[in-house]
Amino acid sequence: EFTTVGIAEKVYFANEKVIQIYLQSVETTKTSEVQLKSFATYLNMNDVEVSFKPSTLFDHHLFAVGTTNSGKSTSALSILDKLIEENKKILIIDPTGEYRDSFSEQEVKKLNLGVDTIVSPSKLSMQQWSVLFEMNSNTQGAVLAEAIKSLRYQHKNGENCCLEKVGKNIAQLQKDLSSIQNDDNDFDISLLPEQIAAESVEEARKGGVYDYSIFRANSNSYLVQKVSYQLSNTNFLDFFKYDPQKKNLLDEVKTFIHTPNASLYINSSELGASEGIGGMIIDLICNCLISQDEIIPFVFFIDEVHRYTKSPYSEEEFHDGLVLLAREGRKKGIFLFLTSQNPQDVSPILLGQMGTLLIHRLTHDDEIRTVKNHLDEYSVKQVKKLNCGEAILTSVNLINNIYLNITKCKRKQYNDTPLL
């Protein structure tokens, strides 16, 4: 942290008492909180243990970033360990399953997405369905909405097949469909491609009934293929389905945020890394959280967040749920704790909301340039040289950047690198 002194310059050696006074003055947070237990030691300061108030780390959100094998996951677990010991509420999203045995059942409630927990179709808005299936025109979105409405009607009446409209009286069918109530939202997603094809109808010239439309069938064919591909070539149906025997993800999240001293762990390792489903589920959770009132404050931890930020359909687009939470969540007591290998994998808007960064080794100039505004000139030069487990903590709540050596906690973590 200190540059080499010049010849004939005065040098002062700080004893342990002076070091402690300096370290206690680094935090600018004036709250009366009790500091968390030490999760690291200071580099170049006789391995003095570091302790911070929770608000110093989280009140402007925390982002841990570093290349693979730089120690960021170990750092994250060390911080989570101290939060759990202090009975702080945590919501954990684990995309790889490496934290699945880190916490006991008494400490956190564990859910396995796609195994014992699903997302009921009733929890998705039409806009979210449109994004998920990459609707590229208003026409496609309207057809999808009509198909979903028809399947909701079928599910309400206990029918396990699509709604055939050809030959049906238009006025009567519209009356039947209007009987759907706000709580009649569940439907069988596996029937969606077939129902979209069944929406290829138009008003017959006589009789006031629906007739098959070749023009609409041709127009809808691409949408049918797209939805069929998503359902048959991904694990989509493992997560989005109506199954009263399994836990509903959003219901579990709502219960968690209103339960004191409770933590929730969600294992999302069954999600495909590049199928877009993960980003949509995170969006759902974020929108669910931001819509709730009287939330008991908690830390929302998402490991490897780059899996959930970028849209799979465009390199320039990002899911906006996390951005919304970063902007508005703090007012409701929701504090983000994110990890990623590359700071460029999150949107610039989201990165701009991160007031505290735990920076591990970064090697690419573009990556370093992204976090350059958070570092002084000396720190920028040191980022490439950090060893595994070493990090620079920079925050709006600290007077100076601090160099840390993270202390590995004793909790089990599946992140060891296999020997070649």
Residue spans for each PLM region:
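Interdomain "pre-motor" coupling segment immediately N-terminal to P-loop NTPase/helicase cores
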Residues: 1-30
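Hydrophobic residues in beta-strands of the RecA-like P-loop NTPase core, especially within AAA+ ATPase
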Residues: 93, 302, 339-340
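Conserved ATP-driven motor cores of ASCE-family P-loop NTPases powering translocation/secretion/packaging/pilus
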Residues: 133-135, 324-402
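Glycine-rich phosphate-binding loop of nucleotide-binding enzymes
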Residues: 35-115, 348, 393
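P-loop NTPase motor domains
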Residues: 97, 101-103, 107, 121-324, ...
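Conserved nucleotide-binding/hydrolysis micro-motifs of P-loop NTPases
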Residues: 96-100, 270-273, 306-307, 342-345, ...
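Short loop/turn elements that form and flank the Walker-type P-loop nucleotide-binding site
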Residues: 57-59, 85-87, 259-261, 293-296, ...
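Conserved P-loop NTPase motor module
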Residues: 178-179, 195, 389-420
